[in-house]
Amino acid sequence: MVHLVDSNPGHITKAERAGLEGIVANIYNTDLSERYELLDVGYLLAFTSSDEVNDYALSRYEKIFGESGAYRLITVDELKGRMTPSEDSVFSYTEDFINLSESNRESAIVREVAFTTTAQLLELMAHAAADVDIAPLFIKYPDGQLHVIPKDPTVFEITTATTCHLVYMGSELPATTGAHQKTEPEEEER
């Protein structure tokens, strides 16, 4: 279950229309640790346009809601190389809030494309880097689990005869040789 916490009731209404659980709350004023709806949260994702809010969300709630992982968006200074991002809490090393917003504006469809080797993943990441309207999000393992893309994708190891998927948003990526592409993976699996 995905829960969106936001102080803007309009954002919560949109999230609920999309099938998410929404809580209208200000993380600075509200103690979310007492909210029963959030007791089963394993991942914390701080995805606001404010670096300060993202940092605050992690520092205040990571130990409560981030038992399986806690991530924030990369800052502009980290993205531009003016600061070094922390290795353990950055969701994407290539996409900040603006980049994700632009990819969503281009195409809000979540897509996935298969790859069977690290070389194919690197090829896909290079295509994504060359197109500002593509935002890589996760690597999907054969068991369906989603994992954050490592800072250095060359370290990603894939076992022989295994097909993983790059999950991304935005324009369509070309399929790698011998791989196939799916659009809106959640819809096709139903």
Segments predicted by a language model, with ranges:
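Cytosolic regulatory regions of ion transport systems
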Residues: M1-R190
